[in-house]
Swiss-Prot record:
Chief subcellular location: secreted
GO cellular component: extracellular region
Protein name listed in UniProt: Probable endo-1,4-beta-xylanase C
Keyword annotations: Carbohydrate metabolism, Disulfide bond, Glycosidase, Hydrolase, Polysaccharide degradation, Secreted, Signal, Xylan degradation
UniProt signal peptide: 1-19
Organism in which the protein naturally occurs: Neosartorya fischeri (strain ATCC 1020 / DSM 3700 / CBS 544.65 / FGSC A1164 / JCM 1740 / NRRL 181 / WB 181) (Aspergillus fischerianus)
Subcellular location: Secreted
GO MF annotations in UniProt: endo-1,4-beta-xylanase activity
């Protein structure tokens, strides 16, 4: 009788575990996350990845937002002056619309992946005209289709000073005003972001530089809606700058520790202004740093322990 009782208990336990696994498999991370009042749980992608059936199936099931990994960057959209190419970006935006996903426009102004013809500009009026035209053309094409734009990206040094770039050299920090005011005039409904990495501590120079500059720019009337951070450790400090929202924008974690991923999710849940999280890719196979296995799905597109831990935490 005792043996039978133990057998029944074991069967019941196994059934409960199986049911839990099935429930996890049927649950979308995006649905679980947004059930807590957040806007989305997203990922980075592009046409090549969305045409991979294994990758696409995961994107469609688990994510509610897409960030183009490369197809909206300047070298992709305007490789030569006045000559625009939107093929890759169009594919991603259309896919997102068809599947009810939000899109993060990434990125309008960045010192990297910048065509040499832009980097070579030395005249203030020329660069101002080029900057306005680029932002206007790209944003007009997707007006009303982009939830938020990374208007300026990675513009700070580690000490919080402005990074040297063609934009800061020729225009000083006024390029920030030009970019945001142009973006607001083109698509008033889009959320406009400043995005950066290594915002790891409220006391870190880069974080302090971000917060102080954003406070100053907001006071001057520059229309910055949000700060995007590629980590989660200083969300409260970033939110204190006066922006209406913050987001975790390019998340990957070397080794994909379950606890670290859960900590990120809990950090966003704990900051009212944090609207969402975007992981930088689906599978380790396609990650820009694949050797460190930083994502939620392994190289065979199978969910890792961190994926299950997030679902369990939500």
């Amino acid at each position: 009788m005792v043996v039978l009782s133990k057998l029944i208990s074991s069967i019941l336990f196994a059934s409960l575990v199986s049911a839990a696994v099935i429930e996890r498999q049927a649950t979308s991370i995006n649905q679980a996350f947004t059930s807590h009042g957040k806007k989305y749980f997203g990922t980075a992608s592009d046409q090549r990845l969305l045409q991979n059936s294994q990758n696409e199936a995961i994107v469609r099931k688990d994510f509610g937002q897409l960030t183009p990994e490369n197809s909206m960057k300047w070298d992709a959209t305007e490789p030569s002056r006045g000559s625009f190419n939107f093929a890759g970006a169009d594919f991603l935006v259309n896919y997102a619309k068809q599947n009810g996903m939000k899109v993060r426009g990434h990125t309008l102004v960045w010192h990297s992946q910048l065509p040499s013809w832009v980097s070579a500009i030395t005249d203030k009026n020329t660069l101002t005209s080029v900057l306005k035209n680029h932002i206007t053309t790209v944003m007009t094409r997707y007006k009303g289709q982009i939830y938020h734009w990374d208007v300026v990206n990675e513009i700070f040094n580690e000490d919080g000073s402005l990074r040297d770039s063609v934009f800061s050299r020729v225009l000083g920090e006024d390029f920030v005003r030009i970019a945001f005011e142009t973006a607001r005039s083109v698509d008033p409904s889009a959320k406009l972001y400043i995005n950066d990495y290594n915002l790891d501590s409220a006391s870190y120079g880069k974080t302090q530089g971000m917060v102080s500059h954003v406070k100053k720019w907001l006071a001057a009337g520059i229309p910055i809606d949000g700060i995007g951070s590629q980590t989660h450790l200083a969300l409260t400090a970033l939110a204190s700058s006066g922006v209406s929202e913050v987001a975790i924008t390019e998340l990957d974690i070397a080794g994909a520790s379950s606890q670290d991923y859960v900590n990120v999710v809990n950090a966003c849940l704990g900051v009212p202004k944090c609207v969402g999280i975007t992981v930088w890719g689906v599978s380790d196979k396609d990650s820009w740093r694949s050797s460190s296995s930083p994502l939620l799905f392994d190289s065979n597109y199978q969910p890792k322990a961190a994926y299950n831990a997030i679902i369990a935490a939500l």
